[in-house]
């Protein structure tokens, strides 16, 4: 765990930590420019994005949850001919996304309270879903199911084991949480997803733990 030094009274520090834990987007608002400058430009996620693309129809609709500034994942999907809607709770990150892709649709929303009038061929929650507290994560699988067409694909990242962690980025604390793999499997099964791929700690992809699943409602 990495936290900024205690430079305020203990109660204020505790309240600040709890706010950062429950609403990571507030931290991203503070580091949006830093993140845009320091996130690696290369698409190390490409093998997973390419596999997803092979499972989608031409010009498929994709919902990018936690799209950030849209680079590099959303940009790559757009270049491939897909229709992408970006959602993020960070206003500052979304401002950058709109500058990067002015012709695209972006929505300022917390994924936990998602409200969109469309269903999609795929949902991506890459390095965004795992910023939610563990107590909020199970509820997301109903949301994933609600916004996918039958046969739609879900691509998300998690931790490799149950727990919490903090990382210091641009001088701000970023909270991460994960359930364990069996919990995710049960949640996917309960919400009628079939697991296509589960890779743990992929060293070629920044040690990401990646899930790809298909929504097959009965």
Residue ranges and their predicted role:
Residues 124-125:
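A conserved beta-strand element that flanks and buttresses the S-adenosyl-L-methionine
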Residues 181-198, 215-218:
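A SAM-dependent methyltransferase catalytic signature shared across enzymes that methylate proteins
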Residues 200-218:
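Core SAM-dependent methyltransferase catalytic element
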Residues 14-57:
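Conserved class I S-adenosyl-L-methionine
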Residues 166-183:
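Acceptor-substrate binding/catalytic loop of class I
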Residues 138-150:
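A short glycine-rich, Lys/Arg-flanked "PGG" loop and its adjoining helix->strand segment in the class I
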Residues 151-158:
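Conserved beta-strand signature within the Rossmann-like core of class I S-adenosyl-L-methionine
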Residues 63, 69-113:
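Class I SAM-dependent methyltransferase SAM/SAH-binding core
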